[in-house]
Design a protein with these regions (language model features):
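Generic structural signal for buried aliphatic residues
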Residues: 62, 68, 185-188
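...with weaker cross-activation on analogous glycine-rich loops/strands in unrelated enzymes
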Residues: 152-223, 229, 260
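Sec/Tat-exported extracytoplasmic proteins
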Residues: 52, 119-124, 143, 147-151, ...
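Second-shell loop/turn segments in exported
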Residues: 99-103, 123-131, 195
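Active-site nucleophilic cysteine motif
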Residues: 116, 128-147
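Aromatic- and glycine-rich peptidoglycan recognition patches
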Residues: 29, 54-56, 199-269
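Extended non-catalytic domains of envelope/secretory-pathway proteins
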Residues: 46-48
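Boundary regions of SH3-family modules and the immediately adjacent low-complexity/disordered segments
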Residues: 1, 8-40, 44, 53, ...
């Protein structure tokens, strides 16, 4: 409609996307793509080129998590195709075979936190889910995605998934209880303004690191603390914290392993 497609993303998000950003595929074409050999970009950032030579013309930029069809490979470059038919070459150091990469994903707090910390300092960008910039929920989504789990897109949706963790007493944040009950890898959820009730609309999310610290995209990706005595105490964030959820180890239809997701499943046994 008027130059836009109404689409549903892999996590179920419904939105409008410009026609120039989408290449429609038939069911047969999608199936062919699913069973094709693919690579995933594991480096933060890179480029594809018209020739197996980084001095040749660029086809496009690439960011961590991009998936492309692999045509063939040499020691130094991978020959790839794009959904819109473009052909390019990527330095092999930037990618891994998708099936191999997927087989090595281990959804642990340590791994999710490690991925999150590689994004330290990235600028905040509303709607962002890459090293070009991230918003708060795009940041947490990327940290889990690169470890094999598709989670809801927005903070207000992410707070509805996983196991609730008790961090409140009498409807307000209990720091002692929170520190006792939270585990690294849990998600913290915040409402706009101070002293909001637990039923307030969630507008921000962070990843808990342990020992009172959390990492989040707020201006830039940074680490703050729930503890008033800490040098990186996040006073405003702490006053607006209203909920916490645990994704790791939870069976929830809103949390979809990449290996089982119909959009990513290769169909190979």
């Amino acid at each position: 409609k008027d130059g836009y497609y109404r689409v549903r993303t892999p996590e179920g998000y419904i939105a409008w996307v410009s026609e120039s950003s989408i290449t429609p595929k038939s069911a047969t074409q999608l199936e062919a793509w699913q069973i094709s050999s693919k690579v995933i970009v594991t480096a933060d950032f890179g480029h594809a080129y018209t020739q197996p030579d980084e001095q040749s013309l660029r086809i496009s930029d690439l960011v961590m998590g991009d998936i492309l069809t692999m045509l063939d490979a040499s020691n130094d470059f991978v020959h790839v195709s794009y959904p819109d038919g473009r052909i390019g070459y990527i330095n092999s150091k930037l990618v891994l075979p998708f099936d191999k990469w997927l087989g090595t994903r281990r959804l642990t707090a340590e791994n999710v936190i490690k991925t999150a910390e590689t994004m330290m300092g990235l600028p905040y960008l509303w709607g962002g889910t890459s090293v070009k910039g991230v918003d708060c929920s795009g940041f947490t989504k990327t940290a889990f995605y690169m470890n094999g789990l598709v989670i809801p897109r927005d903070a207000s949706q992410q707070v509805l998934a996983g196991q609730p963790i008790d961090i409140l007493s009498g409807g307000t944040l209990d720091i002692k209880k929170a520190i006792q009950n939270l585990q690294p890898g849990d998600l913290l959820f915040f409402a706009s303004g101070t002293d909001r009730p637990p039923t307030a609309r969630v507008t921000h999310v962070a990843l808990y690191l342990g020992n009172g610290e959390f990492i989040h995209a707020a201006g830039s990706v940074q680490i703050n603390s729930l503890l008033p005595e800490a040098s990186n105490y996040g006073a405003l964030d702490t006053r607006t914290l209203i909920a916490a959820r645990r994704y790791i180890g939870q069976d929830d239809s809103a949390l979809q392993p990449l290996a089982e997701h119909p959009y990513y499943n290769t169909g190979k046994k």
